[in-house]
Amino acid sequence: LHSGIGVFSGKQRTREEENTLCEVWAEVAEYAGRSGITIGIEPINRYESYMCTSAEEVLRFIKRVDAPNLSLHLDTFHMNIEETSFYEPVIAAGSRLRHIHMTESNRGMLGEGNVRWDDLFRGLQEIDFNGNLVLENFSNSVPGMAEAVSLWRPSKYNADELAKGSLAFMRKMTCEHQ
């Protein structure tokens, strides 16, 4: 769950928007909770959203809503833009962290960009993370993908190569940080 992509007011988030956000999250959490569903709130970078752009903001709103089934959903692509550390948001979230999109800084092959994977996995190990690590690769060899996520340069890898190579990298990192 995250705010609308590319929808901006042109101003900083207002108190009224924050209140509305909390009201909506409370209602969604209550509805989902009746079915035992946990909702992950994903901070999205400032170029795509202005409502919640960092883990700290999401955690503050989760605390305000105070619903046990609201959690943090991190995405390493957005973290690379908005966070100063890949370790600290993981530690700050602790058991509230339930889901992570594993994406390289350039949305390409994991391990070939700027994401500090060792810092991320060290944090995950320290909090005894047992949520979902989800590979999120994008290749413009997939029709429509370039327009959807602004991949304007040709991909170095096709979708299958990207998935296989990135999955191998995730497995290697997971084994190194057990």
Stretches with model-predicted labels:
Residues 52-74, 79-178:
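Histidine-acidic metal/acid-base catalytic patches
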Residues 1-71, 153, 157-161:
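Active-site acidic/histidine proton-transfer and metal-coordination neighborhood
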